[in-house]
């Protein structure tokens, strides 16, 4: 019996080449290549905030050689803003789901501070809590949707892992031992979120073409929203500004 000739494309059998092309061009793979990025800035003269006082616990105070900056307003060069959470709040494909990463989001207790101060996590993603200080801390979450937990972490407990089972808007985390310790977290069903460092920059990748509402959040100054339309393989820029409300 005569075998049919096997055509080859760049050394790859045609049947395999066709399969690879089909996978490459399939919706949700080829299309999910757009991004939205930007910079968050503070508009106006920044208010002077008192440094964090840790005198109540000498073990904490000794971990710092000088004043500890208040995290409520974390500014960089040119008044760029850290500790801003940015996410896609509307416009994602209805009914689409995204698997939770197995890589944990980590909250460290270091220098008697929560690091990072602001973060996002996906539903079901591991949430690793570290105690790098060697002093007593506790993690007291204040959600409205997920079950709250209040977990003591003595010096001997260096690590604990949990997760959140439901999506939830930003909520507060505090330490009952050290009242100045504060953090914020939001729980998402999707991976389209980013938290800024003091350079104020954020990037949200892996978006399909469409029009999205993007929200930027600050713990005291509230939210800013913008509508952003992206095309295929598009890179859009959307900046945000925050300011102290006029009295």
What label would you give each PLM region?
Residues 11-27:
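Bacterial N-terminal signal peptides
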